[in-house]
């Protein structure tokens, strides 16, 4: 897994073509109307649907207001710099409502649950589950076979570019609603209790809890049983 450099992300955002895509349901005398070079139209007689950039389509609507009887616009972003990740060929289970931006790496057999928000430059390892409403900030990196509990936040760092991102090593379990601050590394096999706020690095194979999180014990057999990762949930 390759972590994206902060300056690469900054350059990507700076140089991207900002986009305000819209979907327009349109009705009227549409014959001969061009909705712009980049638009895709699905017109049938006097009605249809147009996909394209708002700046182009807005001009067309204004110029042809005598021909266009009515229209409805669907729009969910303005001057967006980063598109959503194309999910069609990702070898993972991604449930409805997850928001995953472009330039995110997702390993095979990972699971992304409803409402998760995953920002640019994040890395998710093979077999890792990102539970409901988790937030992975920019460049947050999670290893293999982890479980990030519902509502948890792994803080992101894109600026300042010198800042170190959150790194979660393999086989880590993070409980619900935990917060891991910028620059923290969670060591291999560690467990972070629900609701913990982690401000310092966590040693491998230890359990931390509290606000701020502190070590309460080393991993033992009882803890392993309570935090077992089930591969059956990760099968495609």
UniProtKB/Swiss-Prot annotation:
EC number of this enzyme: 2.3.1.89
Annotated function: Catalyzes the transfer of an acetyl group from acetyl-CoA to tetrahydrodipicolinate.
Principal EC category: transferase
Domain of life: Bacteria
Database matches in PANTHER family: 2,3,4,5-TETRAHYDROPYRIDINE-2,6-DICARBOXYLATE N-ACETYLTRANSFERASE (PTHR43300:SF10), ACETYLTRANSFERASE (PTHR43300)
Protein name: 2,3,4,5-tetrahydropyridine-2,6-dicarboxylate N-acetyltransferase
GO molecular function, one term: tetrahydrodipicolinate N-acetyltransferase activity
Protein family membership: Belongs to the transferase hexapeptide repeat family. DapH subfamily.
Keyword field contains Transferase: yes
Keywords on record: Acyltransferase, Amino-acid biosynthesis, Diaminopimelate biosynthesis, Lysine biosynthesis, Repeat, Transferase
NCBIfam families xrefs: DapD_Ac
The organism of origin for this protein: Bacillus velezensis (strain DSM 23117 / BGSC 10A6 / LMG 26770 / FZB42)
Record bears the keyword Acyltransferase: yes
Catalytic activity field: (S)-2,3,4,5-tetrahydrodipicolinate + acetyl-CoA + H2O = L-2-acetamido-6-oxoheptanedioate + CoA
BP terms from Gene Ontology: diaminopimelate biosynthetic process; lysine biosynthetic process via diaminopimelate
Pathway: Amino-acid biosynthesis; L-lysine biosynthesis via DAP pathway; LL-2,6-diaminopimelate from (S)-tetrahydrodipicolinate (acetylase route): step 1/3
Pfam families: DapH_N, Hexapep, Hexapep_2
